[in-house]
Design a protein with these regions (language model features):
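Membrane-embedded helix-loop-helix hairpins and adjacent transmembrane boundary segments
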Residues: 1-485
Length: 485
């Protein structure tokens, strides 16, 4: 690292804080703070959506999978992109028209208010662990950049994200995500990808140096791909962090078109990461761990200045996911859990922006503390997605697609699916495939059986649901009052 590289990194970090301050000046209401006023156009929407779904796991982990498996290492990020495409094409327009703030509020609208608390707890656990995994990644990046101690690196990276997220909420996060999207595009796609391929001697040399399995589309294994689809593609359909970005769209057309563009971008990013990892395998065949491939090729193969920009791209990947997960975690904690536990609805006199700021600050400090205590990023991320998909996929998609589904069925589905997933992870291990396979099946059986065994959802509830889905004017949902009200 040279002075030029350090300057690039420092300017980038300072810019994130400056954008946080700028975003604060645009935030005057709860809608501004939580969903950027629901007024993002297609360019900003697609850029910020791509930024949040392509985090440290997609960048550093995607290159690592390419190093380990070759081109088929792209499948993890490909399934993320395919999930985003499915969400955008089939569901985003309806989601955007609901005009809610959280997934649990959608479940309340659909089922009549019977499942919000338990679904909120499950979603909170998912967003919390997602934020933790992103925050842990700061240790790796800041170690490469500054040689910082792990704890110091986590505190530094976490403090920057907490600061700009707390200042301006979703407006600050939107502005920083757009910069991060551009930095990632330039750093990874336009610089690191071609430089890595050239350094490795081109594709012909890569093919001659590596086993044929490195160029097989299914070299990673069909079962692994199937598991990725269940966890990541379905996770894209129902995660609060993703839905909260859909809520920022100006209208349903922006949500559909912008999301489709972001999903397509993810597919290109997936292939790029796998190719970079494959090139790294040619250049550095004996690395201690596949996830070291990204840092190694950046340190050893890139020229002055470019190295700093690509490391800024890695920071961008981590920060965009971290900030998105943090605001989602705080939104769920405040609006779906705290408000229900105290049983006190908000009124117009409450300073709701201040209350949501407080929750982001508290959740951010909690995330940093857990990140310092944990080490295994992969296991934490797997727990997050297993609990999310096993507990909430069926009642959410069932609510959107099956009018016979009931609140009792949704509650049973969340409880049975979530419990089954957690129990099997304790028995078979966190990284086993059985928890998500069996958990999803158990959740589906419980949802269908209990829904058919109970009275249909009240006609008035369904009528209000269908009118909201159709985009009929409806008042903004009332979020929780602040904790200090």
């Amino acid at each position: 690292m040279t002075a030029v590289d350090y300057t690039v990194i420092v300017v980038y970090l300072a810019g994130m804080l400056a954008l946080g301050w700028w975003g604060m000046r645009r935030t005057t209401s709860t809608s501004d703070f939580l969903v950027a006023g629901r007024r993002l156009g297609p360019a900003m929407y697609s850029g910020t959506m791509a930024a949040i779904v392509l985090g440290g796991a997609s960048t550093i982990g995607g290159v690592g999978l390419g190093y380990q498996y070759g081109l088929s290492g792209a499948w993890m990020v490909l399934t993320i992109g395919l999930g985003l495409l499915a969400l955008s094409v089939f569901f985003s327009a309806r989601i955007a028209r609901l005009k809610v703030y959280t997934v649990s509020q959608m479940l309340d609208l659909r089922y009549g208010g019977s499942s919000g608390l338990i679904s909120g707890i499950v979603m909170w656990a998912y967003t919390l662990m997602l934020a933790v995994t992103s925050t842990i990644a700061y240790a790796t990046i800041f170690d490469v950049i500054f040689g910082l101690d792990r704890v110091v690196a986590i505190v530094l990276g976490g403090a920057i994200v907490i600061c700009y997220s707390t200042l301006g909420g979703m407006w600050s996060i939107t502005l920083t995500d757009m910069v991060q999207f551009v930095v990632k595009t330039v750093g990874v796609l336009l610089l690191l990808l071609p430089i890595a391929v050239v350094k490795a001697g081109g594709f012909a040399a890569m093919k001659s140096e590596l086993p044929s399995s490195y160029f097989s589309p299914m070299g990673i294994g069909a079962q692994t791909v199937f598991t990725y689809v269940l966890i990541y593609s379905f996770g894209m359909l129902i995660g609060q962090d993703i839905w909260q970005r859909v809520f920022t769209a100006r209208n349903d057309k922006v949500a559909r078109v912008g999301g489709t563009a972001a999903g397509t971008y993810c597919l290109a990013y997936a292939v790029a990461g796998a190719v970079i990892g494959t090139a790294a395998k040619v250049l550095y065949p004996d690395l201690g761990a596949p996830d070291d491939a990204f840092a190694t090729i950046v340190k050893d193969a890139l020229p002055i200045g470019v190295k700093g920009l690509v490391l800024a791209a890695a920071l961008s990947a981590v920060m965009s996911t971290s900030s998105g997960a943090l605001i989602a975690c705080a939104t769920v904690a405040n609006n779906d859990i705290w408000a229900r536990l105290r049983g006190r609805p908000a009124t117009a006199s409450h300073d709701e922006v201040a209350g949501n700021r407080l929750f982001i600050l508290v959740m951010g400090v909690t995330v940093v503390g857990i990140s310092i205590a944990l080490n295994n990023v992969v296991e934490a991320l797997t727990v997050a997605y297993n609990v999310l998909v096993g507990g909430l996929l069926v009642p959410i998609l069932g609510g959107l697609l099956w009018k016979r589904g009931t609140g009792a069925g949704a509650l049973a589905s969340v409880a049975v699916g979530g419990t089954t997933v957690i129990g099997l992870m304790l028995w078979k291990g966190v990284l086993a495939n059985e928890p998500i396979y069996i958990g999803l099946l158990a959740s589906l059986v419980a949802y269908v059986a209990v829904s058919l065994a109970t009275k249909p959802t009240d006609a008035a509830v369904l009528d209000a649901w269908h009118r909201r889905l159709a985009g009929d004017p409806a008042p903004e949902p009332t979020p929780a009052a602040p904790a200090n009200a």
